[in-house]
């Protein structure tokens, strides 16, 4: 039995953790951003908060160093601002005149991989794409660059020595050991070592039940959080109902949820020629999984939902990372690729039997239709879970499947809207709910006195059109009958430091341009040949 457990754990590590990457180029010392200031006053904004309140403005916000100290309504729309009521600026105070702009809490990406060696993405590139889209906190699930590397960058970000979001480190279960974990005692030992190393939680892919339960129990005793991608290699033994009951705090993607909803079978119905290592098999059949689950509103559907609600369980759906499965051409042709996607990352995305998430061996209409139906059921469960009081967060998992860091996160917000979330509910999922799931609700997630000064500032109203948050903006016809680009985050403020979001993206473009010049890196579509001059 011990041999069998060891073998299963080895297979999980080799097949799933095999997609984790070696260390990438470290982030340089910060030279960008102004602040923090002894006192910063942001004047005249409309606040779009995550507390359930409607927008309100004009408002002045006072920040001292990195803490929000005052939030003051200073007038009414269409009338002059009441100067007598405004916070007074003293000598040396930094004042931002943001009249007419919108301010939101800094975004939380609950599934943010810090690049990868296989993708050729240096840390600076990833961090600036995130900051360019208002992302001020990320959770790095599996911490694929290694615990030491991730913890070093976490510490540097906390000290604002690098231009980067706040980082939470969730190493992959079993990582860092030179042998598989084969007993509950070893599982508990690894969890204690993980906590001692300063990690914020654990990312699981699955394990033998006695090992998985021991690890979750020990992790819970230590007060740490956890996340799980319920890989098909182990989900047949522990789906989300079992792992949540054992102490798991967050599930990633959809894995483990339809399996918990089975009411006429106990396992996924795999074709006889299925091979997990063939990723076209893996993801094509995943697109047919939700229709094998219990129907919406059925006894099993309601039972699973109610049990997860009782456990205060968090869903982190990462809708965007599978979005290409519904429309591959759209994902490949996204506006931002030609400007912001590195040639090495573009090559990684292309059809490959080796690169993870590049399973476009023969992807066509039938696969896309199946996935569109899959999304309808998946989104229905997630939206209903939210409506019944469940916690749903926003995570992107970018760097795979034609999803680019930052841009993929905004796409996730659009997909939450498609699932049925109201615009304000989308913002809450992207901010306050992420803060709750991370155990940081006292510090981030909303614009409230005493919290960190993490903000997103932009000229356009994202409640009217989420697309204005994309770094490439959106298209609008002006009064001269001319198409123009509007939107994009203007400033990202993290820890009271003001980052010019468009400058962040300009730096990313420069990194991409250099890579193209050095490697003749024109981005060609798969199968397309470069034309000879």
Question: Where in the sequence are the language-model features?
Answer:
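Histidine-rich, glycine-flanked metal-binding segment
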Residues: 24-28, 32-38, 47, 53-104
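Divalent metal-dependent hydrolysis catalytic cores, especially in the metallo-beta-lactamase
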Residues: 126-147, 164-174, 195-207, 216, ...
């Amino acid at each position: 039995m011990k041999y069998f457990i060891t073998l299963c754990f080895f297979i999980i590590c080799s097949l799933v953790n095999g997609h984790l990457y070696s260390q990438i180029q470290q982030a340089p010392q910060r030279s960008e951003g102004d602040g923090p200031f002894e006192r910063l006053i942001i004047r005249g904004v409309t606040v779009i908060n995550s507390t359930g309140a409607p927008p309100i403005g004009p408002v002045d916000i006072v920040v001292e160093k990195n803490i929000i100290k005052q939030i003051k309504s200073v007038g009414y729309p269409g009338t002059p601002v009441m100067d007598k009521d405004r916070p007074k600026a003293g000598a040396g105070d930094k004042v931002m005149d943001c009249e007419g702009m919108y301010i939101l809490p800094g975004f939380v990406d609950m599934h943010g991989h810090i690049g990868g060696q296989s993708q050729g993405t240096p840390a600076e590139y990833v961090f600036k794409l995130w900051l360019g889209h208002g992302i001020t906190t990320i959770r790095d699930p599996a911490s694929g660059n290694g615990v030491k590397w991730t913890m070093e960058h976490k510490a540097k970000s906390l000290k604002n020595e690098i231009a980067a979001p706040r980082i939470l480190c969730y190493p992959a279960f079993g990582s860092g050991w030179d042998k598989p974990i084969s007993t509950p005692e070893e599982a508990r030992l690894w969890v204690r070592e993980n906590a001692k190393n300063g990690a914020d939680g654990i990312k699981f892919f699955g394990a033998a039940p006695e090992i998985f339960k021991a690890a979750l129990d020990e992790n819970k005793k230590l007060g740490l959080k956890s996340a799980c991608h319920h890989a098909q290699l182990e989900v047949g033994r522990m789906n989300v109902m079992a792992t949540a009951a054992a102490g798991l705090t967050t599930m990633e993607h959809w894995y483990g949820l339809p399996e918990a909803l089975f009411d006429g079978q106990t396992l996924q119905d795999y074709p006889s020629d299925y091979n997990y290592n063939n990723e076209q098999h893996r993801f094509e059949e995943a697109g047919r999984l939700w229709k094998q689950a219990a129907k919406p509103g059925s006894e099993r559907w309601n039972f699973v939902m109610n049990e997860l609600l009782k456990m205060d369980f968090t869903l982190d759906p990462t809708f965007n990372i599978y979005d290409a499965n519904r429309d591959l051409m759209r994902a490949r042709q996204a506006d931002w690729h030609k400007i912001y996607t590195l040639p090495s990352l573009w090559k990684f995305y292309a059809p490959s039997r080796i690169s993870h998430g590049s399973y476009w061996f023969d992807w066509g209409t039938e696969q896309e239709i199946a996935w569109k139906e899959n999304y309808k059921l998946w989104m229905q469960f997630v939206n209903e879970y939210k409506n019944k009081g469940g916690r749903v967060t926003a995570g992107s998992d970018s760097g795979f499947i034609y999803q680019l860091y930052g841009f993929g996160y905004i796409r996730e917000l659009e997909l939450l809207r498609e699932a049925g979330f109201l615009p304000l509910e989308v913002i809450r999922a992207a901010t306050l709910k992420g803060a709750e799931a991370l155990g940081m609700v006292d510090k981030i997630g909303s614009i409230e006195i005493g919290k960190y000064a993490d903000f997103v500032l932009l000229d356009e109203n994202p409640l009217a059109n989420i697309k204005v948050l994309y770094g490439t903006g959106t298209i609008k016809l002006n009064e001269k009958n001319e198409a123009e680009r509007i939107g994009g985050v203007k400033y990202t403020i993290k820890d009271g430091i003001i980052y010019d979001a468009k400058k962040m993206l300009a730096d990313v473009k420069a990194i991409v341009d250099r890579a193209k010049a050095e490697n003749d890196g024109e981005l060609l579509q798969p199968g397309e040949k470069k034309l000879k001059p």
